[in-house]
């Protein structure tokens, strides 16, 4: 799937209130695991404050609904712990 197709698919999911399908996709799971590994499963917000918390989520810095073109862009993703992922 190229980026244009990805954006179209995500926009369709948003219109149909089914964005969960994106988060359950193999595309997302693959990138999500890469980010967790690259960031050592560590919450990046806690790390910036000088503490350690294990990451449980991968967060879109620029929100997916506003920026579907960045859905799988690694520079737009960060690991967060449960407390920091709101």
Q: Where do the model's predicted regions map?
A:
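A boundary/linker detector
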Residues: 1-30, 48-52
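Short, flexible, mixed-charge glycine/proline-rich loop motifs
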Residues: 29-39, 70-74
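Histidine-centered catalytic micro-motifs used for acid/base chemistry in nuclease
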Residues: 43-46, 56-65
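Short linker/helix segments within small regulatory modules
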Residues: 62-77
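Short Cys/His-centered divalent metal-binding micro-motifs
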Residues: 48-51, 77-86
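Generic recognition of well-ordered alpha-helical segments
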Residues: 37, 41-44, 79-82
């Amino acid at each position: 799937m190229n980026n244009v197709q990805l954006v179209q698919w995500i926009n369709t999911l948003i219109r149909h209130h089914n964005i969960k399908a994106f988060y359950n996709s193999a595309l997302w799971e693959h990138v999500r695991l890469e980010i967790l590994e690259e960031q050592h499963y560590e919450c990046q917000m806690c790390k910036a404050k000088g503490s350690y918390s294990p990451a449980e989520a991968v967060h879109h810095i620029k929100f997916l609904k506003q920026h579907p073109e960045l859905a799988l862009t690694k520079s737009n993703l960060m690991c967060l712990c449960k407390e920091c992922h709101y």
